[in-house]
Amino acid sequence: MLLRLRGPDGMLRIELDPKDTFNKLGQELMGKLPPTVDPATITVSNAPGSQGDKKLLKDIAKYKVEAIGLKHGDLIFVDYKHQGAEADGTANSDGASQPLTSTTNRLNGQPVLPTEDLPIDPLPTPAPGATIKNPWEVVRQSPLDDRLDKKDGKIPRKRDAMCRHGPKGMCDYCQPLDPFDAKFLAEKKIKYLSMHAHLRKINSATNKPELGSSFIPPLSEPYFRVKHDCPSGHPQWPEGICSKCQPSAITLQPQPFRMVDHVEFASPSIVDSFINTWRRTGGQRYGIMYGKYSEYEEVPLGIKAVVQAIYEPPQVDEVDGVSLNSWDNEKDVNQVARLCGLEPVGAIWTDLLDAGAGDGSVVCKRHADSYFLSSLEVCFAARLQAQHPKPSKWSDTGRFGSNFVTCIISGNEQGEIAISSYQVSNEAVEMVRADIMEPSADPTVMLVREEEEDDGSTSRTRYIPDVFYRRINEYGANVQENAKPSFPVEYLFVTLTHGFPDVAKPMFSDEGAFPIENREYMGESQEHSAAAKALKVHEKASSGSSKDGMKVSNFHLLCFLHQMSVLSKDEESLLCRVATQHDLADAFQLRSTTGWQTLMAILQSTGERIPKRSRQTDVLAADPAASSYPGRRGIDDSDERLAKRFASVRLNARGDGRNGRDRPSAHET
């Protein structure tokens, strides 16, 4: 009889006698499997994946094939694991730490030799796109998302002219509206739904509690990569692919919602100090914005990012862009921000060019006839958002989108310096992850990559599905176009609003001026002398004032003090609390700690020195009469010193005439 066996490495055919046992089947099977297969992990089943009844081959080795009910031509599904690697290609903790030895044998007694072959495209851990069972029980959201989940989000309305009921009644004309009501959003000129309003809209269509059906997570992230562990049993991509594991065609459309609705800068000085680099050097600048997320009342169930500080990582400023260097202390800066109750909320960079009019005006580069966000900036923002995913218990993967925002400082149509805020769509982030698109020289279009590499060879890891987008043609019809080779970038991002509070209450008061990091080429460097000057260490020692010594409410100064590694963790936490909450009791407690006293001693010995007074100033202070005529006193002192110098020269000349030229003078000795 002929049996067909389908496994992870393809289809096998084995001829057996019905009287043979499964031990004989295992011997024939091991001769055709890769040498790295672990015989103890071979399983057989009557259905693919977890649908069938899996049995270990070693447990049924004594049974005959006909006793199980197998007939000629039957299909058996086989699964196994490799030595030193799991079945999905990720490293095994036990096998990876111990090398293979000759004691590992096959079922027929032959030794299994080690191999150097590695999978072409190993899976990351955990596998991307993997779903989570009951994510609403295991996923931990931010406190802000939990608060918004508890709100109903209804938009209240007053009594309308069409109402015919009393003050305590309600009808269709005055009942509250849903947060995703299209008519209300159009009246308020709100272009995009908030994330939680979009969630309510999707959930109302996905789950019907009145029907008694089980709950289904309403959110799902797009996935445009080839799925691994395909249940069809063929070799993994790129050796094999089928309709179940390959991604579907992509139809791009503008994203109807945004994860963050508004960007608020706590103080105008935050942006002004960031732009000073361009004002002084003419080069562009890049920074990471640190702040926190809070509710935004102007949009139903809205979220805003409140920026409290901008950290400038190592970079090389140029007239037309920025080259980023390695940011070695990123974890340290994030730790300081975490102690202050902050987190990275976005990235900001400048794109400014002086108009040459001499009135401070700049050139308007970004407008409706050119572009707002270039293709290169879209890819860069997508990578940043991919590094900051947002956990969500409403998604089947436990995460959905990102709250990371992008701000660009450029010139507007009036020639003024203006800020523009954006976010890249979730589809754009996934297309960058899947390596489907790449930026072009034209900032208004994005290119769809080819499966061939630059040298003409076919990529063994990249799979490019069909990409389409819809547009209004010259006849006013809504048509679908092929995105290859390029498509407009407007399909890949959404716009955000921005602004400043009416009454600025920044977290960092910035009372002590301290240089911003990585500005050495401008003549600004973070040194001990700058820290001593910002903290007014010497003035404190001379005047005894405790208030002057506590000017630590500066994010850049906190990062510098963290790099000095003088304070302990508890003392540094207390320092950040003093800098953000401005509590006088905490300030006195900090002054009494050992670490702070050690820091003050270091800054006093290596920091800023008090300039010494000149001798003339000491004389004027000791002689009040001389201070009444400072000009004449200075003239008399200079004349007196000059007369003494000439007198010394004359005495030396006379001594040389009497005693000879070889004898040194008293002045020379």
From Swiss-Prot:
Where does the record place Polar residues bias? 90-108
Database matches in InterPro entries: MPN, Npl4, NPL4_C, NPL4_Zn-bd_put, Ubiquitin-like_domsf
- Report a single Gene Ontology molecular function: ubiquitin protein ligase binding
PROSITE patterns hit by this protein: MPN
**Main location (coarse class):** cytoplasm
Where does the record place the MPN domain? 263-400
What GO terms in the biological process aspect are recorded for it? ERAD pathway; mRNA transport; protein transport; ubiquitin-dependent protein catabolic process
Chain spans, region Disordered: 87-112, 613-637
A Pfam family it matches: zf-NPL4
Checking CDD domains in the record gives: MPN_NPL4 (cd08061)
Membrane topology annotation: Peripheral membrane protein
Output the Gene Ontology cellular-component terms: cytosol; endoplasmic reticulum; endoplasmic reticulum membrane; nuclear membrane; nuclear outer membrane-endoplasmic reticulum membrane network; nucleus; perinuclear region of cytoplasm
Keyword tags: Cytoplasm, Endoplasmic reticulum, Membrane, mRNA transport, Nucleus, Protein transport, Translocation, Transport
Task: Tell me where in or outside the cell this protein is found.
Answer: Cytoplasm, Perinuclear region; Endoplasmic reticulum membrane; Nucleus membrane
Ranges in coiled-coil conformation? none
State the family it belongs to. Answer: Belongs to the NPL4 family.
Full protein name = Nuclear protein localization protein 4
Tell me the lineage of the source organism.
Eukaryota, Fungi, Dikarya, Ascomycota, Pezizomycotina
